[in-house]
From Swiss-Prot:
Belongs to the RNase H family. The gene is rnhA. Residues 1-141 form the RNase H type-1 domain. GO terms for biological process: DNA replication, removal of RNA primer. Binds 1 Mg(2+) ion per subunit. May bind a second metal ion at a regulatory site, or after substrate binding. It is found in: Cytoplasm. This is Ribonuclease H. It holds the Pfam family RNase_H.
Length: 146
């Protein structure tokens, strides 16, 4: 199974507002950069979108290490999602899970891979995270500001 490091980030100008997501996929000496943007979104949605797009870009099952500066993503996929699914996508307080569409998409995207989820401190000089941040900001720039 191919081993891949994925660095992801989301950005938002206003929350909600124009948002962007970015992902850097590193496979040995090879790299692939992905980014995109959406109007009227949130930082959490863009963080999720970055991981979903990165995993969906993989053409076959892989051993993946996902590096994210989003505790929302890291804890959500590693800890909270099991309870949400058991409760029919409701929180412990029985409220609907926010961003359920993206959580379900991420759950499906991760299913065919072996994934280790790593949280990294954002804006702390971590090269992969800084590159993902720059890609997310490029994603914001693709969205018209009208």
């Amino acid at each position: 199974m191919e081993k891949i490091d994925i660095f992801t980030d989301g950005a938002c100008k206003g929350n909600p507002g124009r948002g962007g997501w970015g992902a850097l996929l590193v496979m040995g000496e090879r790299e692939k950069e992905l980014f995109g943007g959406e109007p009227g979104t949130t930082n959490n949605r863009m963080e999720l979108k970055a991981v979903i797009e990165a995993l969906n870009a993989l053409t076959r099952p892989c051993e993946v290490i996902v590096h994210t500066d989003s505790q929302y993503v890291q804890k959500g996929i590693s800890e909270w999602i099991h309870g949400w699914k058991a409760r029919g996508w409701k929180t412990a307080a029985r409220a609907p899970v926010k961003n359920v569409d993206l959580w379900q998409a991420l759950d499906a995207a991760q299913a065919r891979h072996q994934i280790e989820w790593r949280w990294v401190r954002g804006h702390n000089g971590h090269v992969g995270n800084e590159r993902a941040d720059a890609l997310a900001n490029r994603g914001v720039e693709t969205v018209n500001s009208n």
